[in-house]
Curated annotation (Swiss-Prot):
Task performed by this protein: Solute carrier protein that negatively regulates the cytosolic homeostasis in response to high levels of extracellular calcium.
UniProt xrefs under Gene3D superfamilies: 1.20.1530.20
Main location group: membrane
Compartmental location: Cell membrane; Bud neck
Pfam families for this protein: SBF_like
Highest classification ranks of the organism: Eukaryota, Fungi, Dikarya, Ascomycota, Saccharomycotina
Stretches of the chain found on the membrane's Extracellular side: 39-52, 111-120, 172-204, 264-269, 351-361
Entry's family note: Belongs to the bile acid:sodium symporter (BASS) (TC 2.A.28) family.
Source organism of the structure: Candida albicans (strain SC5314 / ATCC MYA-2876) (Yeast)
Membrane spanning residue stretches: 18-38, 53-73, 90-110, 121-141, 151-171, 205-225, 243-263, 270-290, 330-350, 362-382
Cytoplasmic topological domain residue ranges: 1-17, 74-89, 142-150, 226-242, 291-329, 383-411
Gene encoding the protein: RCH1
Assigned GO CC terms: cellular bud neck; plasma membrane
The protein, known as: Solute carrier RCH1
Length: 411
């Protein structure tokens, strides 16, 4: 049989399709491998473990992701997005207030039903998870893959995590009252650090793993633009960012397995969390979409102001119309709004409840599972988001995104 005949055979075609499919799903395959390794050898990559993952991965892997971001983004666009206060308001209000309030209501309803299979501390962990700030690394990686505004995403994760050191403890004090008094951090005698120490730790982590590599990347890009572009395309550094994200999840699962988090709750609770996390992440993603593109704005502000328009219309248009974001910005907000950080989240939980608290493992289960499932779900959604973004390329002028927006949708 000749080579050409073999290539035309059904066996060769089916084998090629299977190999192409497996290559396309490399992220999920490696994720499964890393979870299996974390289960079998949790001491290797847990916090304080063999490789001191809180430094080698917590700082190193995150720094690589933001170094790549610094090398690939325009300094001018970075400054433009830093000034986009409307997007900051949308993401912060969704990430901290809307999501946590909805979860608080759901958890309170489950607690009121007196379901003995769902541990109260697991529900407390659910509330704690959704009071945490948005995740740092996966948001940037996923937004870049979806061809969204990853520069805006970078601004949101930095602002959200800096403020999260203050907002999350305040939210826990607000929610953990009455029927949830048992979970109030003020009643935990094993707390490890004060809010001031937590904030210092957060600023150190964000400074060394986000700001410094981002700054270095920007300097290198502006001094050596051609060489930087060549490196980005030749070495496919975007794939490197995705692999760094896998290492971060490897660390989270290793820490969870080392703390026996998954064996501290019932199988029914784990099954409930797995399906609940996927459903609530999709719900929050859809909710964030409508929050980012309110239909009433287009109905009220159909036309750009002109000389015959009233002052009220002109001022209202200038203030409200930019809240209807273009598609790239919408994708950035959609990925930031529902996401929750495990890196800072673990530090926040440990500082509030104490690393030696016997209930810590149960509290961390929702956080670790949600992080993994949000990344897997977002990895599926990015292809649809990418198609939606490029669908407007076929339209000469997209009235939904170009009029009154702070940012040009073509950027």
């Amino acid at each position: 049989m000749s080579l050409e005949t073999f290539r035309e055979s059904k066996a060769y075609k089916w084998t090629s399709k299977v190999i192409s499919f497996l290559i396309g799903q490399w992220f999920f395959i490696f994720l499964g491998v890393f979870i299996a390794l974390a289960h079998s050898y949790p001491e290797f990559a847990k916090q304080g473990g063999t490789i001191r993952a809180e430094y080698s991965i917590g700082y190193g892997a995150v720094a690589v992701i933001f170094l790549i971001s610094g090398l690939s983004m325009s300094t001018k666009q970075l400054l433009v997005n830093v000034a986009n206060w409307r997007a900051h308001f949308t993401v912060l209000s969704m990430s901290f207030l809307v999501t946590s309030a909805i979860i608080y209501g759901i958890a309170s309803g489950i607690k009121a039903s007196h379901n003995g299979q769902i541990d109260d501390w697991l529900l407390i962990g659910l509330i704690v998870t959704h009071a945490c700030p948005t995740t740092v690394s996966s948001n940037v990686v996923m937004t870049k893959q979806a061809h969204g505004n990853d520069i805006l995403t970078l601004c949101e994760v930095f602002i959200g995590n800096v403020l999260g050191a203050f907002i999350t403890p305040a939210l826990l004090q607000m929610y953990m009252r009455g029927t949830w008094e048992i979970g109030n951090p003020s009643h935990q005698t094993q707390g490890d650090s004060t809010v001031q120490e937590l904030y210092a730790h957060t600023m150190k982590q964000l400074g060394l793993s986000v700001f410094v590599p981002l700054f270095v990347g920007q300097v290198v890009q502006n001094i050596f633009p051609k060489q930087t572009k060549w490196c980005l395309t030749t070495f496919k550094l975007n794939k490197v960012g995705s692999f760094m994200l896998l290492l971060i999840m490897f660390q989270s699962f290793s820490t969870a397995f080392a703390q026996h988090a998954f064996t501290s709750v019932s199988h029914a609770s784990i099954i409930f969390l797995v399906f609940f996390n996927i459903g609530i992440y999709l719900f929050f993603t859809v909710l964030t979409f409508f929050y980012s593109r309110p239909f009433w704005i287009l109905r009220v502000f159909k036309e750009e102001p002109n000389e015959s328009s009233s002052k009220l219309y002109r001022y209202s248009y200038a203030f409200f119309r930019p809240f209807y974001y273009n598609r790239k910005d919408t994708v950035a907000v959609m990925l930031c709004g529902p996401a929750k950080t495990a890196a800072l989240g673990v530090s926040l939980v440990s500082s509030q409840y104490g690393s030696h608290n016997p209930k810590l493992g149960i509290i961390l289960v929702p956080l670790v599972l949600y992080q993994a499932e949000q990344v897997m779900t977002a990895n599926v959604l990015v292809s649809f988001m990418r198609k939606w973004i490029h669908a407007e390329d076929k339209v000469p002028e997209d009235e939904e995104t170009s009029v009154g927006s702070d940012n040009d949708p073509k950027k």
